[in-house]
Amino acid sequence: MPSIVDIAVNNEGFSTLVAAVQAAGLVETLAGEGDFTVFAPNDDAFAKLPPGTIQTLVQNPPQLARILTYHVAAGRLTKDDLIKLGEVTSIEGSPIPINGEDDFEVKNATVLAADIEADNGIIHVIDNVILMG
């Protein structure tokens, strides 16, 4: 089974995420031993950010890494697990609120595709970049 990184690299809808993970130096982490739960913003999600945001973040790898690790939780958590928990802690250290009442939402993002299995975790595709705070 492919890793989280392999799945992202081989899916055209994640080119911005892949470039950001590379710029932040997180490829080895997300390709390595898991398990991780990744809330993966697609390219459309990154396109919603204000102009210049991605370029600014790529030039600041520590800040970019902090934002990206806010999209990752330890463990292999399915949609059902996440909805039951109501909140998870990101590997960045901040809580991520989960809402499953109407749509399946992660903070300010709606999950477009849930429970994509990888050998080192699980991916949930989201429609917004989730921001801390």
Swiss-Prot record:
Pfam families to which the protein is assigned, alphabetical: Fasciclin
InterPro entries assigned to the protein according to its UniProt record, in alphabetical order: Adhesion/Biosynth-related, FAS1_dom_sf, FAS1_domain
Domain FAS1 residues, every copy: 1-130
Domain of life (superkingdom): Bacteria
Cellular component annotations (GO), alphabetically ordered: extracellular space
Protein known as: Uncharacterized protein SYNPCC7002_A0175
Organism the protein comes from: Picosynechococcus sp. (strain ATCC 27264 / PCC 7002 / PR-6) (Agmenellum quadruplicatum)
